[in-house]
From Swiss-Prot:
HAMAP family: IF_2_B. Residues 625-627 are annotated as: G5. Residues 485-492 are annotated as: G1. GO terms for molecular function: GTP binding; GTPase activity; translation initiation factor activity. InterPro entries: EF-G-like_DII, EFTu-like_2, IF2_II, IF2_N, P-loop_NTPase, Small_GTP-bd, T_Tr_GTP-bd_dom, TF_IF2_bacterial-like. PROSITE patterns: G_TR_2 (PS51722). It is found in: Cytoplasm. This is Translation initiation factor IF-2. Residues 52-68, 99-135, 155-172, 185-197, 273-283 have a biased composition (Low complexity). Residues 355-364 have a biased composition (Basic residues). It comes from Rhodococcus jostii (strain RHA1).
Length: 980
């Protein structure tokens, strides 16, 4: 093969499959990717040497005669046309074709090899006149036969399309001798009518090559019987072809096409000398023509090359068609223009119209789903069948698209068509995700923070909230009691009395602004018992703190002032305790004050499900006076009795510690400090811990008295030092094996928290609000700094709850625990923000830097003062609202004209006051003629005046020339309207 050969071509040539050839190449160390890859000439030569058996089998398997053809015999004196004869080598001199390697010469006519046959089912019945006798001793070339001979076409007494050459004395005529047979083409031969197993070797360069694109005799297609083909039948000896007139308009033998004799090789007619051919098959080109007229070849092959042949026309005659199965043909003829060829692998499926591939069920299902998919604004979206999609808080459209295998750009465009402007990577709030999911028939389920944290811990093979071990590992622990109630009802005074201390005076404004945790030793039935108390603030801004206190507790003491009754924060505390399924003991405080009515408190609390025992309920009420210390022991006894009766206070102290951060703040000398309540396990110095998005290692633990603690058992509140950052109030504390795990958990929590905060704080902009959103809006940027994280959280929630017009936006760009630093000042200067310090002061040179940069720092110690001032600042940023106030009216009584000032109106002030430079409108017959005019000058007598009151005459000029007698000038001014 010339040049580089492809693997599949070599496989066909060698008679093996491409897979076998690829395996052989791999064994030889040659890297070939696929059957379409090319190989170098040395590699191809080695492959041919590796398959000698295929070549020998090729020659040995060639049949001597196809089924249905008689065996060759010695030539008779009178050969019948169409009779089977062996094809001897013609006696006329002709260029000797080079025989293939598999061909063997025959010494005698009886031992000659069969004539070459095409590898398909072409019918060939060679015949020769009696005068053409084979010459013995002349070798006859034999072409390789196909590996499996195809069955012969229906036998018809017709001469072959190209018979063997005749004797040299016959001369050149249509039935004259033809050049020696050539080997068939390769398997993907477009002129063949049947597939071949493997290609045959090419003829030697000395063999004649046809000049026209028509297939050579013996090559174009299969013949019914092999043989070297005798001479064509003489004129008048054509087979019983049912053509009218035995050949009809066929030319005479001497006038046939310029078919050359063997002596004038290569005498193939050039295309210019050939008769014109039609793209349509001629009448003779229909399949199955049984025979040919005298001097003609068998019926024109169906769909011959560029058209069929005329009835009875020979191969070289005008209109002669190619053998059956040519280009565009089907096996047996009858091809139509545009149809595929019959060669296997050459032009697709053998014969017939182009075949469309069948679609699989999956493709059909995808097409059906695509047709049924919802379209929002022309955008095709996936169709959900009510499936539930779980998304984290603050998820983006890219996260949503990844869950449903969709294009994020399509979701962005769909939301745009729904009136929402969101980018693909922007954190989206829950409502928008649910809206988009509903359009696609998906149920979007936003994962709660608790589920998010549980899934995160599961990924690290950690659990929270369960005791390890069996019942024998559990030990009793002290109860955790939370003191709750309305502000100024005496919660902190009660704890002071219990602790024999004074904490209340240290609170700014006399109100508790953070949670305190203490452990108190008390006696019950002569036994000393430990009780852990948690004090929660009662101000309305500290709702989250009260909720955390209720979740971390075993039992709640509800403090209600006997002289004040049930207040809003009292009801809220009841709801928090009932939501946490926590038993409640009611302490009716301030019974020593005048007007105290404990029975009224019992009646009011009955409405909220707290029925006293004396009324037949199960809630214990204790009347106390925290100021005088009345019935404090009875209250503690009631707490312990309720805890023992309703609760199973046991925990496993031998497991890794788990707890909750009650409070956290940034200490100047110790760094981040967290007040932690241990719920199960034992916390020791040196443990790796993670609480929320903060992590670290326990460096020191301190109790409520300031003493160092080496280990903290369940229900023990301690202050933990060693966090890298300040944890959030209410965050769960967990002990892990390594600092690396703690850092990874904290980083993931921080990322989720940041996404959720971005989705919550970002204001949704719809297309209807786009115009107003593009206008310049006022925005108040704040930086919050506090003494502990719970206070900062409460302050931020309260500030976000301020109801203000959409013209002004409040944005907290940074928050933190500790004093105001220079970094905070630089950020405030860059973003034009105000710094609010709550119970903290500026550190170092932060104050000097703030004065130099012009940054406003506000300090507060009571939370509601900060809220009020921020609300006033927001209202001050609103654009002023003006209202129109009427000043007075003046009627024009006379007109004067002046060359300097124009028209002068002589007026009488009928009501109010007319002022100079005031805005006015001109009325004529109670109709507004000019809406906005200005009183440019005002005179009384001949003196300029500022205003003229009712009942006086005046002269004035206005910035409007078309004034008449009888017009009324109505003066007014615009005054700023205060905001509500």
């Amino acid at each position: 093969m010339a040049g580089k050969a492809r693997v599949h071509e070599l496989a066909k040539e060698l008679g093996v499959t491409s897979k076998e050839l690829l395996a052989t190449l791999k064994e030889q160390g040659e890297f070939v990717k696929s059957a379409s890859s090319t190989v170098e000439a040395p590699v191809a030569r080695r492959l041919r040497e590796s398959f000698p058996s295929a070549k020998s089998a090729d020659s040995a398997a060639r049949p001597a005669a196809k089924p249905g053809a008689p065996a060759p015999s010695t030539p008779a004196t009178a050969a019948k046309p169409g009779g089977p004869r062996p094809g001897p080598k013609p006696a006329a001199p002709a260029p000797a074709p080079v025989a293939p390697a598999a061909a063997a010469p025959a010494a005698t006519p009886e031992a000659q090899a069969p004539a070459p046959a095409a590898p398909a089912a072409r019918a060939v019945t060679p015949a020769a006149p009696a005068t053409n006798a084979p010459k013995p001793g002349r070798p006859t070339p034999a072409a390789p036969a196909p590996a499996a001979p195809a069955p012969a076409a229906p036998a018809a007494p017709a001469a072959p399309a190209a018979s063997a050459p005749a004797a040299p004395s016959t001369g050149a005529k249509p039935g004259g001798p033809r050049p020696g047979p050539k080997p068939p083409r390769v398997g993907n031969n477009p002129y063949s009518s049947a597939p071949a197993e493997r290609p045959a070797p090419r003829p030697a360069p000395g063999a004649p090559r046809p000049g026209a694109p028509r297939p050579a005799p013996g090559q174009g297609g299969p013949r019914p019987a092999p043989g070297q083909g005798g001479p064509r039948p003489a004129p008048g000896q054509g087979g019983p072809r049912p053509a009218p007139g035995q050949g009809g308009p066929r030319p005479a033998p001497g006038q046939g096409g310029p078919r050359p004799s063997p002596g004038s090789m290569p005498p193939r007619p050039n295309p210019g000398a050939m008769p014109a051919r039609s793209a349509r098959p001629a009448p003779g080109g229909r399949p199955g023509r049984p025979g040919g007229a005298p001097g003609g070849r068998p019926g024109g092959g169906g769909g011959g090359y560029r058209g069929g042949g005329a009835p009875g026309a020979g191969a070289g005659a005008p209109g002669g068609g190619a053998p059956a199965g040519g280009f565009r043909g089907r096996p047996g003829g009858g091809g139509r223009p545009g149809q595929r060829g019959a060669a296997a692998g050459a032009f697709g499926r053998p014969g017939g119209a182009p075949r469309r591939g069948r679609k699989s069920k999956r493709q059909k299902r995808q097409e059906y789903d695509s047709m049924q998919a919802p379209a929002v604004g022309g955008v095709r979206l996936p169709r959900g069948n009510g499936e539930t999609i779980r998304l984290a808080r603050g998820a983006s459209l890219s996260d949503f698209a990844e869950k449903i295998d969709a294009n994020p750009a399509a979701l962005v465009q769909a939301l745009f068509n729904l009136g929402e402007m969101v980018t693909a990577t922007q954190s989206v709030n829950d409502e928008t995700l649910e809206l988009l999911g509903g359009e696609m028939n998906y149920v979007v389920q936003v994962v709660s923070p608790e589920d998010e944290d549980r899934e995160l811990l599961d990924s690290f093979d950690l659990t929270y909230g369960e005791d390890e071990g069996g019942e024998e590992d559990l030990e009793s622990r002290p109860p955790v009691v939370t003191v709750m109630g309305h502000v100024d009802h005496g919660k902190t005074r009660l704890l002071d009395t219990i602790r024999k201390a004074n904490v209340r005076e240290g609170e700014a404004g006399g109100i508790t602004q953070h949670i305190g945790a203490y452990q108190v030793l008390t006696e019950l039935d002569g036994n000393e018992r430990l009780v852990t108390f948690i004090d929660t603030p009662g101000h309305e801004a500290f709702t989250a703190m009260r909720a955390r206190g209720a979740k971390a507790t075993d039992l709640a003491i509800l403090v209600v002032a006997a002289d004040d009754g049930v207040m809003p924060q009292t009801v809220e505390a009841i709801n928090h305790a009932q939501a946490a399924d926590v038993p409640i003991v009611v302490a009716v405080n301030k019974i020593d004050k005048e007007g105290a009515n404990p029975d009224k408190i019992r009646q009011q609390l009955t409405e909220y499900g707290l029925v006293a025992e004396e009324y037949g309920g199960d809630t214990m009420f204790v009347d106390i006076s925290a100021k005088l210390g009345t019935n404090i022991d009875a209250l503690l006894e009631a707490v312990l009795l309720t805890a023992d009766a309703a609760l199973d206070l046991r925990a496993n102290p031998d497991m890794d510690a788990q707890g909750v951060a009650i409070e956290a703040h940034l200490d100047r000398g110790r760094g981040p400090v967290a007040t932690v309540l241990i719920q199960r396990g034992t916390l020791r110095v040196g443990d790796s811990i993670v609480a929320g998005d903060a992590y670290g290692r326990v460096r020191r633990m301190v109790d409520e008295h300031g003493d160092d603690v080496l280990e903290a058992l369940p229900s023990r509140p301690v202050q933990v030092v060693g966090f890298t950052s300040v944890p959030g109030a209410g965050d769960n504390l967990l002990v892990v094996d390594e600092d690396r795990i703690a850092r990874q958990i904290a980083d993931r929590r921080n990322a989720r928290k940041r996404n959720a905060l971005a989705a919550k704080s970002r204001k949704r902009i719809s297309l209807e609000d786009l115009d107003s959103a593009l206008k310049e809006t006022s925005q108040l940027n704040l930086i919050l700094k506090g003494d502990n994280s719970g206070t900062v959280e409460a302050l931020e929630e309260a500030l976000h709850g301020i109801e203000i017009d959409d013209e002004v936006q409040l944005r907290v760009i940074d928050r933190g625990v500790g004093g105001v630093t220079e970094t905070n000042v630089n950020l405030a200067a860059a973003s034009n923000a105000i710094i609010i310090g709550f119970n903290v002061r500026a550190e170092g040179k932060a104050t000097e830097l703030a004065n130099r940069e012009g940054v406003d720092i506000r300090y507060y110690s009571v939370i509601y003062q900060a809220i009020d001032e921020v609300e006033k600042a927001l209202k001050g940023m609103l654009k002023p609202i003006y209202e129109e106030v009427e000043l007075g009216k003046a009627e024009i009584r006379a007109m004067f004209r002046s060359s300097k000032v124009g028209n002068i109106a002589g007026c009488l002030v009928t009501s109010g006051t007319i002022r100079r430079n005031a805005k006015a409108r001109l009325l004529r017959d109670n109709t507004v003629v000019a809406e906005t005019v200005t009183i440019s000058s005002l005179k009384r007598e001949k003196e300029d005046v500022v205003e003229v009151r009712e009942g006086y005459e005046c002269g004035l000029t206005v910035t409007y020339s078309d004034i008449k007698v009888g017009d009324v000038i109505e003066a007014y001014e615009l005054r700023e309207k205060p905001r509500d």
